[in-house]
Amino acid sequence: MQKLRSTSTHLILFKKSAQLLLALLWIFYLFFPKSLIAGNLSSLSHLIGNQDAILVGDPTGRVIFSKNAQKKLIPASILKIFTSLVALHFLGEGHRFTTDFYMDRDSNLKVKGYGDPLLLSEVLDEISEILITKFESIRDIVLDDTYFQHPIVIPGITSSFEPYDAPNGALCVNFNTVYFKQNNNIYVSAEPQTPLLPFVLPRIRQSALDRGRIILSNEKKETTRYTGRLLQYFLEKKKVKSKGKIKIGRVLKEKDTLIFKYVSRYSLKHIVAELMEYSNNFIANQILIASGAKLDPPGGTLKKGVRAGHFFAKKILKIDNFSFVEGSGISRKNKISADSMHKILKKFKAYHYLMRHTDREFYKTGSLKGIHTRAGYIRGRKGGLYPFVVMINTPGKTTDSIMARLLAALG
């Protein structure tokens, strides 16, 4: 009997020891790899100066390494990740921008824009194919861009000819840019789908460039008028007689007749993918302003867009300490911490596949003079996504050496 009790006791002790060993092995499995990764990442610390920050999370969202994570820094274009989330929240990933076409009693064609960021030459060409089934001739083309405030002044935007300074508006085409080159000393279009209209030649000559992509000006509503000129070109190419002028005006819904509503072929999710790929400042602020108009209708202003951003940051992401003045990241007045960017990345994880990517990294970069940033996700050896934020606000430094070590540590 005594021997039986002894055997039973040994079995109980063995089971408890086995359970303890399994628990220790489980803890080791859960935490040792992360501790090892954190140890590897600690070598990055000396690369992060007082005006820089880094944060790395694990696939569950837990922070495994950080330095200066609470410091508010200039994010540059990684801010577009946040702007995309704002638009996805207020507009919905399936949202499609619209443009309305009316006829008034005097046979004037009226066009009302609602901020479509991907209204392109080929789209206007397709629209004209539909419009020619509605009429054979028109008088004036009247352009209604009143859905957005005019002008919209974006902090950080200058009056240069560079595409990143393109102005925003409710009725714009080709990102408010013109792409040209010279052929036998004559200016011609540099893209087959877009004619080079005489309307833009003074602006091209003013740029003093032989070739390139320049922006149109907001002065005298040049950007809006260009949309009308391009539409007129495509209509006349299809033998529609245009007897009048290109004018700025308003649609009178109680008097004018809606003859066609163009619904964009591109969903907002597609637009966000384009934004992540090309980092277009114009697109970023178009979707921000449209988000503001959704939150506080009718009509879009930058102020409403910024308000929508702050609302989303505070109520949805629980971010309070955030300086947000526009959606593209071009303004140095935008400031955010790596910790707040981590919250943004956790929310954007469901859309990570919309970002630029290599074999292991999904990412968005940002750069201004003296500023280099990078944020996204690195796929670990077990397939999980590790969110990361690197913000370098020290002039003369880049993210290159940091990213090389980060990829190696998580490889």
Region annotations inferred by a language model:
Residues 15-23:
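Intrinsic disorder/low-complexity segments enriched in small, polar and charged residues
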Residues 1-15:
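N-terminal secretory signal peptides that target proteins for export/translocation
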Residues 41-42, 89-319:
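Conserved serine DD-peptidase/penicillin-binding transpeptidase domain
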Residues 22-31:
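Bacterial N-terminal signal peptides
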Residues 73-87:
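Active/ligand-binding-proximal structured segments within catalytic/core domains
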Residues 323-411:
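C-terminal soluble interaction/assembly domains
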Residues 36-72, 91-94, 130-137, 409:
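Beta-lactamase-like hydrolase cores
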Residues 49-51, 78-79, 96, 106, ...:
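Extracytoplasmic
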